[in-house]
Amino acid sequence: MRDSVIDIRGLDRVQRARVQAKEEAPKRWSVDDIVALFELPFSDLMHRAQSVHRENFDPNGVQVSTLLSIKTGGCSEDCGYCPQAARYHTDVEKQDLMQLEEVLAAARAAKENGASRFCMGAAWRSPKQRDLEPVLAMIREVKAMGLETCATLGMLKDGQAEQLKEAGLDYYNHNLDTAPEYYGEVITTRTYQDRLDTLDRVREQDINVCCGGIIGMGESRVQRAGLLAQLANMERPPESVPINLLTQVEGTPMYGMDELDPFEFVRTIAAARITMPQSFVRLSAGRQSMHEGIQALCFLAGANSIFYGEKLLTTGNPEAEADRKLFDKLGIHPL
């Protein structure tokens, strides 16, 4: 008996996308395609995501990073979610660029706690050359410890990506934050194209790209799908895709927004895994607010990278020991 074949010619765009979502990945993901993934029954979506995950990764392995804020607060941008913006009245205290030895001490502690990558974040719109020089020294010294290095420093000017590459930088983080259609609701001091231009400069130097977004900022499901479409359809999708859950900080414009349903966040992780099968999908900011059960569902949905211990820029993050206990419960091991 022949397997039944669905004739999709008479279906509308969304119906066709739903059928295709159950079958095979398109060469280029449309927003409709990704919305159709979101709309699958939860068990079907999880099965699809886990199947894709197992085809490309050790299903029980998770890459572990530690993120250190090497320069905090005082940023001139107006990102509506960010407590480091100088224009917002938050509890974040401005701190100048850390000294090299302070950073190296944090990197040693991260390595001892099982991290394989050390990420350095600075609250700049764009680094000045005089500020970049000490960061280059940090990258070289952390790299010499045997850790992978990552930096998030804001927009890069011509020539700066080359300097980062020469210093040995492995990853550069620069998020798109949200879909182009919703971007103006989040930030006005930097354009979407500015972000894409920085990513192009990073790619030109063959530095791995870490690029994702923030979920739960009031965007629609279609706009969440739009963010994933932007990422998945890049000429080379990001090697690392951080999916952040908005951490609401009093004093920022996005404080007091309706909280995202946890299962919608899990669906976002699953859709990211399906659309970017060879990328590491990082369960990033907001994890400290998640019940262990939701974190477990995120791992099942294809998340295979986390930030471990320390502080995630200016928001809390579960301590390393709590993470180890969760890994033990789930049979997960660090990569």
Curated annotation (Swiss-Prot):
It is an enzyme of class 2 (transferase). Its EC number is 2.8.1.6. Residues 60-284 form the Radical SAM core domain. GO terms for molecular function: 2 iron, 2 sulfur cluster binding; 4 iron, 4 sulfur cluster binding; biotin synthase activity; iron ion binding. Binds 1 [4Fe-4S] cluster. The cluster is coordinated with 3 cysteines and an exchangeable S-adenosyl-L-methionine. Gene3D superfamilies: Aldolase class I (3.20.20.70). [2Fe-2S] cluster binds at C119, C150, C210, R282. Pathway: Cofactor biosynthesis; biotin biosynthesis; biotin from 7,8-diaminononanoate: step 2/2. Keywords: 2Fe-2S, 4Fe-4S, Biotin biosynthesis, Iron, Iron-sulfur, Metal-binding, S-adenosyl-L-methionine, Transferase. It catalyses: (4R,5S)-dethiobiotin + (sulfur carrier)-SH + 2 reduced [2Fe-2S]-[ferredoxin] + 2 S-adenosyl-L-methionine = (sulfur carrier)-H + biotin + 2 5'-deoxyadenosine + 2 L-methionine + 2 oxidized [2Fe-2S]-[ferredoxin]. Disulfide bonds: none annotated. One of its GO terms (biological process) is biotin biosynthetic process. Pfam families: BATS, Radical_SAM. Its cofactor is [4Fe-4S] cluster; [2Fe-2S] cluster. CDD domains: Radical_SAM. [4Fe-4S] cluster binds at C75, C79, C82. Belongs to the radical SAM superfamily. Biotin synthase family. NCBIfam families: bioB. Homodimer. Catalyzes the conversion of dethiobiotin (DTB) to biotin by the insertion of a sulfur atom into dethiobiotin via a radical-based mechanism. This is Biotin synthase. The gene is bioB.
